[in-house]
Amino acid sequence: MMAIFISIVLVVSFVLFNRVQAKKSIYNYIARQGIQESQLKYIDFHKDFKMGGYWLAVYVEGENPDIYYEYSYQDKKVNFQAYFNSEKAIKKKMWGGSGLTEIEMKKLKYPPLQ
C-alpha cells in the first residue's frame, strides 16, 4: 500500500515539475521577445497530448487583432509560431487559422528569437 502511495506521489511530482518548467521556459521566451505579462490576453496553456510537451496560445496586446502567438515546449526547447485567425475566434480561444510565412513572421511586432 505504501509503495503505491509513493509511486503516485512521484508521478504527480514529475508531472507538476514538467508543467512548471514548461510554463517558466515559455514565459522566459516571451519576456526575451520584449513582451510584458500585462500584454498577454486570452491565454490558453495546456498539455499537448498529441505532440507531447506543453502548448500556450495567446493574443498579445498591440499586435494585429487577427494574429495570435503560439508557443510549444518540448524536449526543453521553446518553439514559436504565429497564426492569422479572426479577432472574434481569438477572443473565444478558438485556435486555428493559417500560419504566417517567414516574411510575415519577421514583420510581427514581436518576431521570433534567433
Swiss-Prot record:
Superkingdom of this protein's organism: Bacteria
UniProt keyword terms in alphabetical order: Plasmid
Explain the purpose of this protein.
Possibly involved in pGI2 replication mechanism.
> What protein name is recorded for this chain?
Uncharacterized 13.4 kDa protein
- Organism, by scientific name, is Bacillus thuringiensis
**According to the entry, what is the taxonomic lineage of the organism?**
Bacteria, Bacillati, Bacillota, Bacilli, Bacillales
